[in-house]
Amino acid sequence: LFTRLAALRGRRALLAAFGLGALAALAMPPVHAIPVLLLAIPGLLALLEGASSWRRALVLGLAWGWGHHIVGLYWISYALLTDPWRWGWLVPIAVPGLALPIGGFIAVAVAIAWFARPGWPRLVALAGAWVLLEMLRGVAFTGFPWNLMGSVWAFAALPVQGAAWVGVYGLSLVTLLLAGLPRLGRRAMAGGVVAVMALAGFGQARLAPEEPPPQPVTLLLVQGNVQQEAKWREDQRWPIFRRYLDLTAQGAQAARVPPGGRLVAVWPETASPFLLPTDAAARDYVARSLPPGGMLLAGSVRAEFGADGQLQRLFNSLSAVGADAALLGTYDKAHLVPFGEYMPLRGLIPIRVVQGGIDFSAGPGPVSMAPGGLPAFSPLICYEVIFPGAVTPTERPEWLLNITNDAWFGFSAGPHQHLATARLRAVEEGLPLARAAQTGISAVFDSRGQMLAHLGLGETGSLAVPLPGPGALTPFARVGIWIPLGCALMALLLGGLASIRRVK
């Protein structure tokens, strides 16, 4: 098969590259069909052997990356279907249009790998360049490190334990090296089997010790399951608020809080239809749903007004409300979603996708906060959790809190892929992570990424879980992306030194 792929030319080669990239997307959450990479990556290497120049390699890589991200990011079109009469015409354009520039990062990696000699030098060079371009994708423009190759292992805690050392980028490097081995022959594949067994053994050894004891806090994750179509309707504000209040009161009554402990309810991103930071009446209702000593951490819009009473700025925020209705603290989202929370190039783009008449403003971040004496945590709103190294190193928290509204994406792969990034952040930082999602998937992970409890997609209810204790400082938390960056650079250098080749 690989020999036939290497012989393809012209459009057939491009179609094959596109198909292999699309196939590779099945390795991503929630399918996790990792064996397809044993065809998709060696197939790409085979097609690369037939490329007559680095420019041809660039086009082949673009076709592979385009197919990969069209399939992997298909769920983005669901957000447009929440208002089909207004945005339905964008459905056939949005995903291919987004997938093309993202696929360009893979294209550049493939073009770089073309200069390496076929065989193991090219595989190593491809893996190194690929990971370097993944890192660049995580910071370029506003950054979009979604569906990184290392996330294919996030279906369970055991396969991702290496992220505590090398992060998800390091897992990407290992994944690409292992996936490309079939192109190198049976001996290489046998070595790959041994490597996988060794990695599994490492993961099992890291999971063997007992977790630190839980903290004296019981988290109550509240999942209101409010559909996006109803979320901002004026006539639904009170029913939605009432639903969250009732779920909180019922969950608090049923929760088993140990003596000396306290209950902390968590609502998802923008779950409150009212502005909790400035609406004292809404906070009074919240206080009535909390037990004595309890607290609510809720997603709520925060507004700033000028001296003339005119609205000046809006923030996508997390608000901490005490059982006495006092506002104990706020966090304003720092990493905003382009086109979702603000319009980039506003003067040049004639259409407006964001809701409302004003863009959201960004706050400072990342931060650690400890309202009302809670164990310090790092709040991550929505896709802030997809960025590795999302914890401030100067004020290391004791846990991570991710609140999100994935109702935009319905029953698609999007919420599952988002959840996978949360597991990876817990392992990388060695910190427990709690996640409250509007329509799911709400969950609690311990400091090694083991899921302790969850509410599934489309469920309505609450989940009471003791807050796990923090783990030891991981090498990745200590050093950050410098470890995977160094590994990727060494791989690229090794592949280059093994096969210095004249540029054609």
What is each PLM-predicted segment?
Residues 207-482:
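Soluble catalytic domains of enzymes that build or remodel membrane lipids, polysaccharides, and related
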Residues 1-207, 411-412, 422-425, 437-445, ...:
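Membrane-embedded alpha-helical bundles of multi-pass enzymes
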